[in-house]
Regions:
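Short, Gly/Pro- and small/polar-rich lid/capping loops
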Residues: 1-35, 39
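Short alpha-helical segments and helix-capping/turn motifs at coil-helix boundaries
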Residues: 18-21, 31, 126-128, 161-167
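Glycine-rich phosphate/pyrophosphate-binding beta-alpha loops
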Residues: 21, 50-58, 181-185
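Short acidic-glycine loop/turn motifs at beta-strand connectors
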Residues: 38-43, 173
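Metal- or metallocofactor-binding catalytic centers and their adjacent structured scaffolds
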Residues: 44-142, 146-147
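Electropositive nucleic-acid engagement tracts
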Residues: 138-162
Length: 259
């Protein structure tokens, strides 16, 4: 497996409504699209991946300029895309592993935070997986379970050495996905709290979103203020109860963590 061509493009996108997370609120951001060609012998296929480049997502420095944050994100992507075509491996996973290790060494040598460096690796990884699946006309789960990708979980997490994929995932495949709705820190819960209404006929408040779409899976952003966070979660549970849905949710407060 070799990456014989890799290109990236940037589009400027705007959010429908402001999205607040941690110390930042996003209304617009660059959107990176990456395209690569993966070659195996005489065969080749193209793969794609894309990612927003949001301020303060990978680094939590309140004093840095947004322009500098974007440059830092572009730099880690540029390094990963420069390294990828220099590698060759017997499997797609081995190719990713080489890139992963190279990116880590570069990050340590240049004082780049690991989470930020991982952005570059992950973007190439997703395009690589897409291309590898297209080479054999397989879905992602088929490529994983058949061994086509060469995935070795124990190389990432040694404690999984004696855990086979068949044992872990056999019979767990599905043909449905639940839509998970993210509740941002400043997202209005009810219509009377709506401030930034785009007037496009689509719901804005969480109450209106549940009423329109019937969503019952949520990711709730928290800010580290225990009293305020608990109060907000209670209100969300009350909304779910009013709509007679059984809510499933995760709590996301990583932006408020210091270590």
């Amino acid at each position: 497996y070799r990456v014989v061509d890799i290109q990236s493009r940037v589009a400027h996108v705007a959010t429908r409504i402001p999205f607040r997370y941690g110390i930042a609120e996003m209304t617009q951001a660059p959107h990176m699209v990456l395209e690569l060609t993966l070659k195996r012998g005489t065969e080749s296929a193209r793969g794609w991946a894309s990612e927003d480049l949001p301020p303060k997502w990978f680094t939590k420095d309140p004093d840095s300029e947004f322009r500098d944050d974007v440059v830092d994100m572009v730099d880690v992507i540029a390094h990963a895309t420069a390294v990828a075509p220099t590698l060759a491996a017997p499997t797609a996973f081995d190719l990713w592993w080489q890139l992963h290790e190279s990116q880590k060494r570069w990050a340590r040598a240049n004082g780049v935070p690991g989470l930020l460096a991982g952005l570059g690796t992950a973007l190439v990884e997703r395009a690589l997986i897409d291309a590898a699946c297209r080479l054999d006309g397989l879905s992602f789960d088929e490529a994983i379970m058949s061994g086509t990708l060469g995935f070795e979980s124990q190389r990432v997490h040694p404690e999984l050495e004696h855990q086979s994929l068949d044992e872990a995932f056999s019979g767990r495949g599905g043909n449905e996905l639940s839509i998970r709705h993210t509740v941002g820190l400043s997202d209005p819960l009810t219509d009377d709290e709506v401030v930034d209404d785009p007037a496009d006929g689509l719901p804005v408040s969480l109450d209106a979103v549940i009423a329109r779409y019937g969503v019952d899976h949520f990711k709730i952003k928290t800010k580290g203020d225990l009293s305020a966070d608990i109060s907000r979660i209670r209100r969300i549970l009350e909304l779910a109860s009013a709509h007679k849905i059984e809510p499933w949710f995760t709590i996301d407060g990583n932006e408020s963590m210091t270590s």
